[in-house]
Amino acid sequence: MSLTEAEYHELEKQVNLDDIDFSDLEEQYEVDVGLDNYVVVDGAPIAPEAKVPVLIKVLKKLFNTVGKVVEGDEGIYMPLEDGKSKGYLFVQFETSEMAEAAIKQLHGKKLDQKHRLLVNRLSDIEKYGVEGNVAAEFVEPELPPFKSHGYLKSWLQDPQGRDQIALHHSETFGVFWNKKKSDPEPVFEPRKFFTSKYAKFSPKGTYLFSIHPQGVQSWGGADFSSIDKFMHNQVRLVDFSPNEKYMVTLSPLPITAPDSAAERAVFPFGPESYGHKLVIWDLTTGEPARTFALPPHLEGQKEMPWPLVKWSHDDKYCARQGPGALAVYETPSFQLLDKKLIKIDDIVDFEWAPAGVHLANNKSENGHHLLSYWTPESSNQTARVAVMQIPTRQILRTVNLFQVSDCKMHWQSEGKLLCVKVDRHTKSGKTIFTNLEFFKTTEKDIPVEKLELKEIVINFAWEPKSERFVIISRLDDGNLNSAIPKNIIDFYAPDVNGKGKSATSVYKSYKTITDKHSNTVFWSPKGRYVVVATISRSNGEIEFFDVSFDDSNKNAPANVKLLKNDKFSGMTNISWDPSGRFVATWSSSWLHTIENGYKLYEFTGNLLRDDSIDQFKEFIWRPRPASLLNSADRKKVRANLREYSAQFEESDAMEADAALRELIYARRRALEDWKAYRAKHASKAVKANEVQAEIIEEIKEEIIEEKEEIVE
């Protein structure tokens, strides 16, 4: 039965289509009209129409590396105008996930020297390109109000001159005032999950940094308020320039663009940083100053050499090592010095001088920037150690070495001396022994003194601002039984012969201690006192030495005396406080769970505290900046040292005994009350006894001589 046209229209009027559910049909025949699988690409080369097919073929091959481009003409559309391409194109992938991968991996990709591709979602272009979605006139962003963090070096104003320490145990982290034998005093309430890995002070103590999955957080001021955030996903390692201007972070994950446009708007990295893992941050602005990809030979390594970026003493230069070359950058531009690498075949390692060096033939007020490096032996050349001046790249001194197994470079704190520890092997290769090569950088032509040893040196440490040093060595006799103590401790100092310009010096061991397990050396930052320790899970030991014990003999270069020693099973770390007054040792749960906790000693070895703390991780002294006192100020302090010592001894006694502290405070209050009472009543007594004075002038005559004469 068929309906006439009139009957159909009548029936249509009777049926309400809004009451009919078409959802099943709509779902069955749904058509995808979304744009999520489309991307728009800017920055492509502008090519003549005849070469467009070739360009499309090249680009399609590139985009197929991250997904699958739709086949045919629909896959890539490149608009033309006036017989040439317009520099952008549209790419359609089979899925939105492929388009997302293209944005993350190819945004910022350099196609050649002149062209960098910018890949974005087509939906974002539509969103921001539609009229009305973006304001026609520029609206100046509102700057957030300035937030003061207080005086960032406020801890230096402590009346008692105390140092601050950071204690990290389990998931709790806190900063405290060191109170010697007493419990540390919290600077702020210790916090749980303050950091997800570890925390670190900047080299001069201005900032405290915590590590998180999202990046690094900086803290500072009297109450350690939040200062800045540095976004670097899954950051693992952190380092700083000596003057706290820059921070270096490393993550195992390459930098990629965030998913959303809103996140990309606040993302600190540009397309040129995508794929990089190493970031140098400007701590003043909080922005990245430069990013780097890891060298190919470091990709995939389980143990990463650190730091990857090394700094000159004044933050003026930084350098990083690559295969067969050294890259030196100038700050703050972080451009290559002279726009080229320093070619050094097979370079193994390098170190900057830790201070400006005053060369004998080229005086400079602030000293010169020097760095040292070494290269290994090859079939046609010997191993080589060289000292180079920056920025001239001039090689100032070279020493050729043979039968070399390894080298370690140790700069003296003032840059006046460089010791190169050269581990050499016999011709058979069965025995290792050490030579020490001393470069005297401030003397004419940088002479080199050699110290030949029969043993292999396992630890070397310079005394700060001195020419003395300590080494730990052992004889390489093939006996690998670690239970037998066979390490040797030697205390060296220069033995000077002659006077004036004709004087010569050679290094001489002034004390030797044999049959030890000791394996580490830690000098006081102020010199003279040194800790020699055995860091071991089972037989930890620490010994305190004074290398200038007999002050009566001023001409003796060294006079070594053992002050004290102590046992600490499971000891993993040792650290001096910045003032050289205290030494902290601790057992970290990061390495084992044996007797976790810390011990605090005076510089003479007297034990002050012994705290066993479950899951104790780390003890950190807060560093101090260099002293502002000049030589005259220091001389004045030394002259009044007895007076200052009495004040500090009284303060120490008060801290140690609460009852004594209250007694001293009570006596001080009573003395102040007496002084106030006396001043008040003495003035009253003067007023009560005041009498109106009258000045009377009285002339007295005295006969000195009487003489009688007769006048005729």
Swiss-Prot record:
Q: What is its main location?
A: cytoplasm
Question: Where is the protein localized?
Answer: Cytoplasm
Q: Name one GO molecular function term.
A: identical protein binding
Q: Does the keyword Transport apply?
A: no
A GO biological process this protein is involved in? formation of cytoplasmic translation initiation complex
Q: Which residues form the RRM domain?
A: 37-124
Superkingdom of this protein's organism: Eukaryota
Cysteine-cysteine disulfides = none
Q: State the WD repeat positions.
A: 191-229, 230-293, 301-339, 342-384, 452-493, 513-555, 566-604
Q: Which CDD domains does this chain map to?
A: RRM_eIF3B
Q: Which UniProt keywords apply?
A: Cytoplasm, Initiation factor, Protein biosynthesis, Repeat, RNA-binding, WD repeat
Write out the ranges of the annotated region (Sufficient for interaction with HCR1 and TIF32): 1-98
State whether keyword Protein biosynthesis applies. Answer: yes
The GO cellular component terms are:
cytoplasmic stress granule; eukaryotic 43S preinitiation complex; eukaryotic 48S preinitiation complex; eukaryotic translation initiation factor 3 complex, eIF3e; eukaryotic translation initiation factor 3 complex, eIF3m; multi-eIF complex
Chain segments carrying region Sufficient for interaction with PIC8: 1-224
Q: Which InterPro entries match?
A: EIF3B, eIF3B_RRM, Nucleotide-bd_a/b_plait_sf, RBD_domain_sf, RRM_dom, TIF_beta_prop-like, WD40/YVTN_repeat-like_dom_sf
Question: What's the stated role of this polypeptide?
Answer: RNA-binding component of the eukaryotic translation initiation factor 3 (eIF-3) complex, which is involved in protein synthesis of a specialized repertoire of mRNAs and, together with other initiation factors, stimulates binding of mRNA and methionyl-tRNAi to the 40S ribosome. The eIF-3 complex specifically targets and initiates translation of a subset of mRNAs involved in cell proliferation.
Give the quaternary structure: Component of the eukaryotic translation initiation factor 3 (eIF-3) complex.
Give the record's family classification. Answer: Belongs to the eIF-3 subunit B family.
Per its record, how is this protein called by name?
Answer: Eukaryotic translation initiation factor 3 subunit B
The organism encoding this protein is: Scheffersomyces stipitis (strain ATCC 58785 / CBS 6054 / NBRC 10063 / NRRL Y-11545) (Yeast)
Upper lineage is:
Eukaryota, Fungi, Dikarya, Ascomycota, Saccharomycotina
